[in-house]
Amino acid sequence: MARKTNTRKKRVKKNIEAGIAHIRSTFNNTIVTLTDTHGNALSWSSAGALGFRGSRKSTPFAAQMAAEAASKVAMEHGLKTLEVTVKGPGAGREAAIRALQAAGLEVTAIRDVTPVPHNGCRPPKRRRV
């Protein structure tokens, strides 16, 4: 039986001017996804995908690097302006937004879409270190 060679599809260059940056910032990691206005992903990056491990994943610097990496790929697709949606309580929220602006993308709006429970699940107990 012939063995299939693992061929990767070449990324098709899209020409998209405006998009949305979804920043998911948790206590452990920061994930940045850049999409078009319909929500179709153009590029994504995270602190863990860039090689940060353990407690270094949750730092603002790691979030900044993730935002830079995602914006570099998205700008190749022609992305220029962004709306930013931020979700989660993590340390990398502001750092990721600043990195997107520094990369040359124009931020038109910042929206906080962190889910707030109407007294749903019991939160984790306090840490005693």
Curated annotation (Swiss-Prot):
- Record-given protein name: Small ribosomal subunit protein uS11
What GO cellular component is one of the record's annotations? ribosome
The record, for Pfam families, names:
Ribosomal_S11
UniProt key word Nucleotide-binding: no
Could you provide one GO biological process annotation from this protein's UniProt record? translation
User: What's this chain's function?
Assistant: Located on the platform of the 30S subunit, it bridges several disparate RNA helices of the 16S rRNA. Forms part of the Shine-Dalgarno cleft in the 70S ribosome.
Concerning PROSITE patterns, the annotation shows:
RIBOSOMAL_S11
Establish whether keyword Transmembrane is in the entry.
Answer: no
Q: Which family does it belong to?
A: Belongs to the universal ribosomal protein uS11 family.
Q: Which NCBIfam families match?
A: PRK05309.1, uS11_bact
Which is an annotated GO molecular function term of this record? structural constituent of ribosome
Task: Give the multimer and partner information.
Answer: Part of the 30S ribosomal subunit. Interacts with proteins S7 and S18. Binds to IF-3.
